[in-house]
């Protein structure tokens, strides 16, 4: 069995959480069950990939015999063993943040934490209205109204708001400019689902477009990897999003 981090173990009367921090230009760490114990493993560097339909998936078809190509004069990721008497104590553990490279920016006041709704299931189950539920302006305004009424910070437009291959090809039933105006008036932030490998084709261009239609965040899905190339893509997306003050939910890693 293969396990990604964070991983939590109970050893007698203690809880041990294994984490990592400062993973830059390097693959993530996995745990492999080996009998009664676990051993660590890194995904090897991808040499060749094969794209699925419209970049909806990207499969590694050939890997190297090594895990990374990087410089020797650098720091490598921290491995953390967080130990607690009770599970709840791990929630406030700050080691991941304390061991990470300090942030390049000093103002993150624009990042507003908050609860979100999304339309993935809900848009299929809206009844008793004068419109048909689905991926359309009326349904999304309905969600925005719900958020505004109950003080929920974000509304996530999930898969279907655009073409999966080209994020600029917006669903013809959706007026993003009108929705953005409507959401802004009600102080609800719009978060857009994007496929990682569609976004990869033009990270800065697509983020410029999303910013222009009022995006406050993106939900990035279907990386399905954390080898060196994937980790570098995480950082590229995060860096470009930071420039535009767009928050990120890295969803499918």
Residue ranges and their predicted role:
Residues 28, 90, 127, 200-202:
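Short acidic, gly/pro-rich beta-turn/loop elements at beta-sheet edges
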Residues 6-8, 144, 180, 237-238:
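Short amphipathic alpha-helical segments and helix-helix/interface helices
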Residues 158-253:
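Aromatic- and carboxylate-enriched substrate-binding clefts and catalytic-loop regions
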Residues 1-103:
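N-terminal accessory beta-strand-rich subdomains and adjacent acidic, glycine-rich linkers
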Residues 71-154:
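An acidic-aromatic substrate-binding cleft motif
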Residues 7-9, 18-20, 78-82, 117-119, ...:
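Generic structural hydrophobic/aromatic packing signal, biased to beta-strands
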């Amino acid at each position: 069995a293969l396990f990604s981090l964070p991983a939590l173990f109970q050893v007698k009367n203690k809880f041990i959480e294994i984490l990592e921090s400062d993973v830059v230009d390097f693959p993530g760490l996995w745990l492999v069950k080996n009998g009664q114990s676990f051993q660590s493993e890194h995904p090897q560097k991808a040499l060749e990939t094969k794209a699925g339909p419209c970049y909806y998936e990207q499969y590694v078809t050939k890997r190297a015999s090594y895990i990374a190509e990087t410089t020797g004069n650098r720091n490598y990721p921290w491995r953390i063993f967080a130990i607690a008497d009770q599970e709840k104590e791990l929630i406030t553990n700050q080691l991941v943040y304390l061991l990470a490279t300090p942030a390049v920016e000093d103002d993150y006041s624009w990042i507003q934490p908050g609860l979100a709704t999304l339309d993935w299931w809900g848009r299929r189950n809206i009844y008793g209205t004068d419109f048909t539920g689905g991926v359309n302006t009326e349904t999304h305004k309905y969600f925005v109204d719900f958020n505004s009424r109950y003080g929920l910070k974000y509304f996530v437009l999930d898969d279907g708001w655009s073409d999966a291959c080209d994020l600029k090809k917006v669903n013809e039933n959706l007026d993003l400019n009108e929705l953005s105006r409507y959401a802004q008036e009600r102080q609800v932030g719009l978060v857009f689902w994007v496929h990682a490998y569609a976004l990869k084709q033009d990270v800065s261009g697509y983020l410029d477009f999303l910013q222009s239609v009022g995006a406050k965040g993106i939900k990035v899905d279907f990386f399905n990897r954390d080898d060196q190339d994937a980790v570098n893509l995480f950082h590229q997306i995060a860096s470009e999003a930071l420039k535009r003050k767009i928050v990120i939910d890295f969803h499918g890693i």
